[in-house]
Amino acid sequence: MATVHAALHAADASSSGSSSPVTASLYVGDLHPSVTEGILYDAFAEFKSLTSVRLCKDASSGRSLCYGYANFLSRQDANLAIEKKNNSLLNGKMIRVMWSVRAPDARRNGVGNVFVKNLPESVTNAVLQDMFKKFGNIVSCKVATLEDGKSRGYGFVQFEQEDAAHAAIQTLNSTIVADKEIYVGKFMKKTDRVKPEEKYTNLYMKNLDADVSEDLLREKFAEFGKIVSLAIAKDENRLCRGYAFVNFDNPEDARRAAETVNGTKFGSKCLYVGRAQKKAEREQLLREQFKEKHEEQKMIAKVSNIYVKNVNVAVTEEELRKHFSQCGTITSTKLMCDEKGKSKGFGFVCFSTPEEAIDAVKTFHGQMFHGKPLYVAIAQKKEDRKMQLQVQFGNRVEARKSSSSASVNPGTYAPLYYTNTHPGMVYQSYPLMWKSANMIGSSYPNSEAVTYPPMVANAPSKNRQNRIGKLDRNAVSYVPNVYQSTQMLPLSRDFSKQQHSRTYGRGKEMKKSIQQRQSETVGMEMQLLGELLHPLVEKLEPQLANKITGMLLEMDKSELLLLLKSPEDLAVRVDEAFEVLKSSKTNLTAPNTHRSDYLASGIAGVSIK
């Protein structure tokens, strides 16, 4: 008979036959989600022959799957690691360490696997292992737990040898542990288990009349086969409490009786007849049904719940419900309030179906309500929004890397970070324009000349602080109130006259509302939004203002307008973007960072057609 023990030795034998050194691999399970590969490596670093560790992650989200592997050159060190680290705490959670069995047949054949149930809550992995280790070498031992770490009351023990499993079953089954009788039996896969419905003999019935007697029930069920016993539950007045049990000699007779009598009228009521279940079994079934229903409702609510903001503070929940009830049946409405009970200007409306929620978004998004335009969208959890931002940020950075490596000419500045991906705009790189060490300028053919302030080495900065990087190891800054110099090299671009007339000292013109620029192109509108957002973001996160502004510009234009009016909402969005940048693996300080900083300071007011 094949065993896990034999599979392990077979793996070693195959390894020793090759030129590579013999290695031993351990499975490390039940890891805390916060455990990284570095933490995992440090946990096993005391064993000198440790070669590597691997933490398994979800391919789409990158989140830990809470298990991994540790690889050793020495099998002796691996054995020692199991003894020391199994059932030890790592980041506040008890971990499991066992041999890694790569052969699928050896993992799944169930040889030596024992199922234990009705365990007291005090029984942990370590206690369970101590109970069974006297019967033989244990490969794996686990007590099933809930999310909060509490025991589910059952567990599994896998031995190297099948004989050890048989001995454990014979000895420990029906023994008392902490005043509870435990069950120990051979583990069987769900596909191999005999369904209870196929062999039950005991039936439960309810909806009985108070005056029903055992003779009447026996007469009713005797036609299906031999009855072993029949019992009616009675109250203190010897009247039927509405339910009873009947036990047949043959499971087939019991099945036929349940199928035939269930739902039929007996006396004044319709009977329910089904397989009699133990209390623990009924509770487990009810828990599963509740969990299934809860998950179903959760999934429906996830796509049926809408987020509404920019709500007038005078609006009540009842008014909000009445306004949105035009689109369907509302199950709940909630306006968020501060500690004083004053509305925060946003809330949630949950519909009965996802279709109604989508209709509400299409109908009410941007609609005026009590003098303010509503922002309406499908509600998202903070984690989901963060993950979405991470994906968008990662895709944009990859595209930026590929485009910069393929198309950016040497000696040019990359475009502003927040102007990479908006439709309708073609962005060009800006060539270096140095005529001398301290002057820079530009001119435009067939149009007005635009004066750019010169850059002077080591001059004090007056317009922006800490936004200019180092160029040629010298600090540079803008000198205001300068004229067009003849020492400047020309830079040709086809800008509109309106864009030519803008300079960086004209801050008032940058703050014109979007409504006054409806005739401009979509690209110019997004550029202007970027110009308005950038100084606000810079006050919150000076070092990452360019990148965060670019991430915000991926949002809907109507929401961007609301962010400009609401400093609180803007701060929340900036915090979310900062967390995304912080958690990403991307190197935020690229070699050409000073170029982006120069553009952020020097040409943020110029849009390109």
From Swiss-Prot:
Which GO MF terms does the UniProt record name?
A: RNA binding
The answer to whether UniProt assigns keyword Disulfide bond to this entry is no
Chief subcellular location equals cytoplasm
Tissue specificity, in the record's words, reads: Expressed predominantly in siliques.
Query: Which GO CC terms are listed, alphabetically?
Result: cytoplasm; nucleus
According to its UniProt entry, one GO biological process term is: regulation of translation
Localization of this protein? Cytoplasm; Nucleus
Q: Which InterPro entries match?
A: Nucleotide-bd_a/b_plait_sf (IPR012677), PABP-dom (IPR036053), PABP_1234 (IPR006515), PABP_HYD_C (IPR002004), RBD_domain_sf (IPR035979), RRM2_I_PABPs (IPR045305), RRM_dom (IPR000504), RRM_dom_euk (IPR003954)
Function per UniProt: Binds the poly(A) tail of mRNA. Appears to be an important mediator of the multiple roles of the poly(A) tail in mRNA biogenesis, stability and translation.
Q: What is this protein called?
A: Polyadenylate-binding protein 7
Question: What is the source species?
Answer: Arabidopsis thaliana (Mouse-ear cress)
Q: Which gene encodes it?
A: PAB7
